[in-house]
Amino acid sequence: MNLQKFSRYPLTFGPTPIQPLKRLSAHLGGKVELYAKRDDCNSGLAFGGNKTRKLEYLIPDALAQGCDTLVSIGGIQSNQTRQVAAVAAHLGMKCVLVQENWVNYHDAVYDRVGNIQMSRMMGADVRLVPDGFDIGFRKSWEDALADVRARGGKPYAIPAGCSDHPLGGLGFVGFAEEVRAQEAELGFQFDYVVVCSVTGSTQAGMVVGFAADGRADRVIGVDASAKPAQTREQILRIAKHTADRVELGRDITSADVVLDERFGGPEYGLPNEGTLEAIRLCAKLEGVLTDPVYEGKSMHGMIEKVRLGEFPAGSKVLYAHLGGVPALNAYSFLFRDG
């Protein structure tokens, strides 16, 4: 496998720490050891997160093409668009963000706080569009790219989640390589890695990265899209493409993609009672915050899998914390009493 042949622009602090979740593990019976890899703490650029890790491989391509404007898309409380805005500000580039109405949630401040507030503060041209949720290519995004060109700019197209991009899976191939180096220092291997999945390239990159030592199917994706068939297809397609790009040496098959579909409902961006319980439990036991859209759902999935005995006793499970906490501000009514 050859990740080193790709240019990488440093936007993160370096390898992210792995933290034992001792109190949460004990609360759940102590038979499974839980750890978190803190990609939510990976950068000083507007809180960072998993998209910042991905953007390290997209930015050299944007600079090589002489682009002057980063154009991306997400929901109103998109972590993706906030991280793209931060990187654009850091590099002195312009930024156009299409923010669609992906979440069926209504709050007086939903489009004024959290991620979208930060994007505006960092100088991004934020464009609210009423279209609903989908993880495919969007006309509103294509229109924004065309508008930049019409105004004489040179846009660089960054799709939702950085996912459906030729380089979108590389960052999390690097995540797997990073974990392997940390495992050597820790003196043990993780039996499972739990990760949230929606647009697919985070899990796809991990699948490829961990396939290098035979652990592709130990990456347990937790769907948060509530459209798991679409998410699964995208993970597999991106993983196949990424495996070819990094010269993995074997094909990625559907057996390599494990996606738990039980925790994504009722809809994308709407937490269920299990999501909210997991958010509160992790906060109170560990001081680790997760959000209602993504990490709360993957945390719920991990907790429930421990409770149901789906991880064998003695397992060491690594939770990939991808970020997303700024969105908590947009759901403040749900947490008005803690």
Swiss-Prot record:
It is an enzyme of class 3 (hydrolase). Its cofactor is pyridoxal 5'-phosphate. It catalyses: 1-aminocyclopropane-1-carboxylate + H2O = 2-oxobutanoate + NH4(+). It comes from the Bacteria. InterPro entries: ACCD_DCysDesulf, ACP_carboxylate_deaminase, ACP_carboxylate_deaminase_bac, TrpB-like_PALP, TrpB-like_PALP_sf. The keyword Metal-binding does not apply. The active site is at S78. Belongs to the ACC deaminase/D-cysteine desulfhydrase family. Catalyzes a cyclopropane ring-opening reaction, the irreversible conversion of 1-aminocyclopropane-1-carboxylate (ACC) to ammonia and alpha-ketobutyrate. Allows growth on ACC as a nitrogen source. Homotrimer. PANTHER family: 1-AMINOCYCLOPROPANE-1-CARBOXYLATE DEAMINASE-RELATED. This is 1-aminocyclopropane-1-carboxylate deaminase.
